[in-house]
């Protein structure tokens, strides 16, 4: 660390990404990359003609992609927020909805970036232990008066909480954001997106990195009440309005149009998970009931 670093960050423990093999011959199971390539439509969207337009700035609003995602999820474009991977959205959420007086709560065993963001913004956080069966006890998050952050399905356990349990958390924390990180939702979980019509404090975050086979493109999106989306847009436009490049936007649009391709791939991955689980249990191992791709 140099002598120029602010004392605020002197003790910060940064997130450590997993090693990225340079020969690109492997699928990294530890980061849950998809073994399948992007859809043919996505590959076709990155044409030489579009590459030649990289001298132009991308659309900071991502209007076309927002409209396509809104149609896919049955919401309005004003309910969609786009960013450079779901990590970016998590970052903005901690920045926008937490401070020294408004804390956060999340499972003790979960995605490693949650405590990093809490430390980065000096947010008082409560790390709640899992149950003995490694599940999340939703009751621990009721009436907690903090921003609640839950990965559903959870990583690294793959276990999920029900919509009824999420709804109870929302009801009992009406003045705090409830962020549900659905990075692995397409592998067998039940999305809570429909609940945004009922609860204006729900923020659902998804990614293109897992089921949509675009980890290298860096694209994530959130679905929430228009007011929450406006808050996130304010943070985005105060930091980097052009945080999604032109080619990623085009790839994202093509991926929505070829959604059936990704649904089928997710089914194959889930089937492999179930087969592996069955074999391991037959060998005497204890395996959690995962709804993720692991």
Predicted regions and their residues:
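Phosphate-binding glycine-rich loop
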Residues: 63-103
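PLP-dependent aminotransferase-like
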Residues: 96-151
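Short Gly/Ser/Thr- and Asp/Glu-enriched loop/turn motifs at secondary-structure junctions
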Residues: 288-294
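Glycine/small-residue-rich loop that forms an oxyanion/phosphate-binding "nest" at active or ligand-binding sites
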Residues: 85-98, 162, 180-184, 188-189, ...
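N-terminal "arm"/small-domain region of PLP-dependent enzymes with the aminotransferase-like
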Residues: 1-56, 144
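Active-site phosphate-binding strand-loop segment of PLP-dependent enzymes
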Residues: 131-186
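PLP-dependent aminotransferase class I/II
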Residues: 201-281, 285-288
């Amino acid at each position: 660390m140099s002598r120029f670093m602010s004392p605020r960050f002197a003790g910060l423990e940064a997130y450590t990404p997993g090693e990225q093999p340079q020969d690109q011959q492997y699928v990294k199971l530890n980061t849950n990359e998809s073994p399948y390539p992007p859809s043919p439509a996505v590959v076709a969207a990155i044409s030489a003609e579009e590459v030649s337009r990289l001298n132009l700035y991308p659309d900071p609003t991502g209007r076309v992609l927002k409209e396509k995602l809104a149609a896919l999820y049955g919401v309005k474009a004003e309910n969609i927020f786009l960013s450079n991977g779901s990590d970016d959205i998590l970052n903005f959420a901690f920045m926008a909805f937490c401070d020294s007086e408004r804390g956060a709560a999340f499972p003790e065993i979960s995605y490693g970036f949650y405590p990093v963001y809490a430390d980065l913004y000096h947010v008082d956080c409560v790390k709640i232990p899992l149950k003995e069966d490694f599940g999340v006890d939703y009751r621990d998050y009721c009436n907690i008066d903090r921003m609640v952050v839950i990965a559903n399905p959870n990583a690294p356990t793959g276990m999920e909480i029900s919509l009824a349990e999420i709804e109870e958390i929302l009801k009992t924390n009406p003045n705090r954001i409830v962020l549900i990180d659905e990075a692995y939702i397409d592998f067998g979980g039940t999305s809570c997106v429909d609940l945004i019509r009922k609860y204006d404090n729900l923020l659902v975050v998804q990614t293109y990195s897992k089921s949509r086979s675009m980890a290298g493109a860096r694209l994530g999106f959130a679905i929430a009440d228009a007011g929450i989306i406006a808050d996130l847009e304010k943070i985005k436009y105060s930091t980097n309005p052009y945080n999604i490049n032109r080619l990623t936007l085009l790839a994202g649009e093509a991926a929505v149009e070829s959604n059936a391709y990704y649904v089928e791939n997710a089914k194959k991955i889930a089937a492999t998970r179930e087969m592996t689980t069955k074999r391991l249990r037959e060998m005497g191992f204890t395996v959690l009931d995962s709804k993720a791709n692991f």
